[in-house]
Amino acid sequence: MSATPIIHLRDVKKRTGVLNAWERVRNKPQVHWAMECFAEALGVFFYVYFGLGSTAAWVIGNILKQSGLSSVFQIGFAYAFGILFAIGVCAATSGGHFNPCVTIAFTIFRGFPPLKAVRYIVAQILGAYIASALVYNQWKVLIVESELLLKQAGVYETTMFTPNGPAGIFALYLLPGAQTLPRAFLNEFVNCFVLALVIWAALDPTSFMIPPVMAPFIIAAAYAGSIWGYAVPAISLNSARDIGCRLFALTIWGKSAAGGSYSAIAALVNIPATLLAAVVYELFLVDSDRVVAGSHLEFMNVAANHRRHRQQAEDDNLVEADDSSQEKPV
């Protein structure tokens, strides 16, 4: 039985000289990290851009008494679609973290380089900030109108920096009188723990029930489920989404948009929850005696047969062969 031939894109599709020249520069190790960071920023941009847009319709629609513009159900779908677009467009370049807690977990459990992790996290937060800036400018007229209506009604101070106010489109806040900090912590921790278990299962090569092609949909569904069930009690799920969007809210509205003690819960709780989920999955659900599913094996081979990876492996083999052929001193 003959082996499946390895065909790279350049073998079947010719690019122009300018693009080939750019690709040679872009793919140098000294430069390629910037492409990976760009992909991480773009992925978070997708996730945040679609989610915030739907949230803006919900918040502004409620203030302006325009029913039917959005709903929690629609917001969950918007974030889910953003995740699908992020993974589909960007994961092949960066590996598809799109969340600081995932990057930190990969650094601890999968040997991801710490310096690269810092770059990824900065890029992720930047992607969320840029998405916030665009959403704000696209909705600015209605946001300003909503602020004026709140001031005219005399409820600006009590509504503006809550989930029901224009600032709540971007930064995450507790619903006044409806949630305590300990319960917000519990809500965030449990949702992030469950979400991380789903992510780890989607990455498990022996998980034949979740082939690689289905992993984006499974992960997106987990995010949507958390939003549908627990957004009202307050969840963040993603440090980049929280920090990047909160920084933007601070840029527009100043310190009043900070969010108080809850901001620490929204930004940080997902990290220990994800790490604990990774430990639980590795200890209780990973089984090295299981067979690697064929779809996962194909996915792993595609990654391993990347042209630069193969070239590097061949170069390393040549160096090893050259070293072994040298006469050893007696």
Curated annotation (Swiss-Prot):
Any idea what job this protein has? Water channel required to facilitate the transport of water across membranes. Also mediates the transport of carbon dioxide across the membrane.
Q: Which UniProt keywords apply?
A: Cell membrane, Membrane, Repeat, Transmembrane, Transmembrane helix, Transport
Residue span of motif NPA 2: 238-240
Q: Which residues cross the membrane?
A: 41-61, 72-92, 125-145, 158-178, 184-204, 208-228, 265-285
- In Swiss-Prot or TrEMBL terms, this protein is called Aquaporin-3
The record's Gene Ontology cellular component field reads:
plasma membrane
- Motif NPA 1: where? 99-101
Q: Which residues lie on this side of the membrane: Cytoplasmic?
A: 1-40, 93-124, 179-183, 229-264
